[in-house]
Amino acid sequence: VITAEFEDFFLVTVYTPNAQNHDENKRPKRLDYRTKEWDVDFLAHCKALEATKPVIFCGDLNVAHQEIDLTNPKPNRKNAGFTIEERARFDAILEAGFVDSFRQLYPDATERYSWWSYRAAARSRNIGWRLDYFCVSQALSPQIQDALILDQVLGSDHCPIALILR
């Protein structure tokens, strides 16, 4: 987590730890750490900052929030990044007053992904997940002009995303 303070807002960049697939109980190995510690602490950090001024946070949150945020939701329900617990923690972010900038503008957009496995030519077939986000404090949501997924940019299993504010 890197937090930068600007005159009118805080910008927080984050890599959220992957819950990792599966232990002997067929559940992600670090799911409890991810959902009961990391996600809780990260949201508390953002809310503490927000007490002073609005917050923008961005990065790899390692969760596909909705079924439309990945190609194959049904077979992935128990996999890291799409468990009920991880999705519920993203719900908590929204309930705490943060806005998923992409979904605010494109609530029904499908096949818009920011990550593709290196296996089985997933990227060329657009079999992916939307794991990367720009979330903003509710106070900033009217200023969202666009939220972009730059899926034509190569060089990683993730692609860049961008947020344009008025």
Language-model region placement:
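Active-site regions of metal-assisted phosphoester/phosphodiester hydrolases
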Residues: V1-R166
